[in-house]
Regions:
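PDZ domains, with a preference for the canonical peptide-binding region formed by the helix
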Residues: 146-178, 257, 333-334, 339
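Conserved PDZ fold ligand-binding element
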Residues: 63, 136-159, 243-246
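C-terminal "post-core" interaction segments
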Residues: 16-24, 201-406
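PDZ/PDZ-like peptide-tail recognition elements
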Residues: 78, 90-126, 191
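PDZ/PDZ-like domain micro-motif
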Residues: 50, 132-145, 198-203
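Terminal peptide-recognition signature
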Residues: 58, 79, 116, 136, ...
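Terminal targeting/pro-maturation regions of precursor/exported proteins
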Residues: 2-91
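PDZ-domain C-terminal substructure recognizer with occasional recognition of PDZ-binding tails
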Residues: 125-126, 148, 162-201, 351-352, ...
Length: 406
């Protein structure tokens, strides 16, 4: 019987190594060991490159191959912005470091800009109001003008928050806005300056034989509740028997301010409930120290640009039977965002959940993309061809308790 053939030692060692690798592979996948616990070369062989490494690899390739040189920081900014854009959520944004600084400035009652309030438009930003003495006023900008580009960059499809941050900037610097008006376009260059936003405006009017206090709020910025409280108390001292709370053109702001301002009209109970996938449900109640007595009638004046925190207040007062909504249907922003600061100085502003009125209505109605808003109890609309404020006239008669003429 012939003796068995002996395999070369090299072949045996090689077979052992291959077998060892196979066992390690089985250990990784069948034994639930994570590839990251293995040596680097073996990890790459078994699991491939980590996802973040693929992203960096793609940025490297774009930066080294594209025919024009693009700064690495811009590539990263654009990559993050692209991820957020894929959410197809008009309220979620990525702010570059410069944009984030300007975004935070929007929460204050003063900022450096051109002195306007705007609303979102699919083509850009629609001018709602121009402040007296502002760069925009001096440049001839009027309500109704449409900004379609900033410094040559289109605003079409850009979220309102990002678009407004592009207009703002350091005092003394120039910004060129492309304005569409009466079917024509022209570039208007303005020098940014410090702009103080009148957060609250108040006046005493008469209707139906009663003195009516009118309080207008432009934004729910930090400390806005204190100005609203002060205005209400001043009007009460002057004999106000009912109130019109004007939220037209108010695009919202801080939810905590909305709670405090609604508390000026509500003695107790629920104001708003927030719910999200990864955030605990939260209910905000009235603080229990109202300024306006229960017997005083209130009309809340709203329009299509009344949004977010404004809708929280208007919706709470409507649901609780405390006020009559006058005007047009509101914007319908039934979601809230969470701001997440990033290590590069920028930030993500991501939709984290929805909010609901005391009766459980979601203000967005049909969800993130299109909102139904709040339906007014008394429809009223201004005629842009007249200088009169027809909607305010209806609100005054509503608060005064007399019949509203159709």
């Amino acid at each position: 019987m012939p003796a068995p053939r002996r395999r070369p030692l090299v072949f045996v060692i090689l077979a052992a190594l291959v077998g060892g690798l196979a066992l390690i592979s089985l250990g990784v996948w069948l034994g639930a060991r994570h590839p990251s616990a293995l040596p680097g070369p073996l990890e790459r062989a078994l699991a491939g490159p980590p996802a973040d490494r693929v992203v960096e690899e793609a940025l490297d390739d774009v930066g080294s191959t594209y025919y024009r040189k693009i700064p690495r920081s811009q590539l990263r900014d654009d990559a993050i912005a692209g991820v957020v854009a894929k959410l197809q959520d008009r309220f979620s944004n990525y702010f570059t470091p410069a944009e984030y600084k300007r975004f935070k400035d929007q929460q204050e009652s003063s900022f450096t800009g051109v002195g306007i309030t705007v609303s979102s438009d699919p083509r850009g930003l629609r001018v709602q109001k121009v402040f007296d003495g502002s760069p925009a006023k001096r440049a001839g900008i009027v309500a109704g003008d449409l900004f379609v580009a900033v410094n040559g960059k289109t605003l079409a499809g850009v979220s309102g928050d990002v678009a407004t941050t592009r207009i703002k900037g350091p005092s003394g610097t120039d910004v060129t806005l492309t304005v569409a008006h009466d079917g024509k376009r022209k570039d208007v260059t303005m020098t940014r300056s410090e702009v103080s936003v009148p957060v609250v405006a108040s006046t005493l009017r008469e209707a139906c034989g009663k003195k009516i206090g009118v309080v207008g709020l432009s934004q729910f910025s930090s400390g806005a509740h204190a100005e609203v409280y002060a205005a209400l108390k001043r009007l009460q001292k002057r004999g106000a028997q009912a109130f019109v709370f004007d939220l037209r053109g108010n695009g919202g702001g801080l939810v905590d301010e909305a709670q405090l301002i609604a508390s000026a009209f509500l003695p107790d109970g629920k104001i708003v409930t927030t719910r999200g996938r990864n955030v605990p449900e939260r209910t905000l109640d009235a603080t229990g120290d109202p300024i306006v007595p229960k017997g005083d009638k209130i009309a809340v004046l709203v329009d299509r640009n009344t949004a977010s925190a404004s809708e929280i207040v208007a919706g709470a007062l409507q649901d609780r039977g405390r006020a009559t909504l006058v005007g047009t249907r509101t914007f319908g922003k039934g979601v809230f965002q969470e701001v997440i600061e990033l290590s590069n100085g920028g930030a993500l502003d991501i939709t984290a959940g929805q909010y609901f009125t005391p009766n459980g209505r979601n203000l967005g109605g049909r969800g993130v993309k299109t909102g139904t808003g709040l339906k007014p109890d008394v429809p009223a609309k201004d005629d842009p061809k007249t200088r009169a404020d027809e909607a305010l006239r209806v609100a005054l008669r509503t608060a005064g308790g007399c019949a509203v003429k159709s």
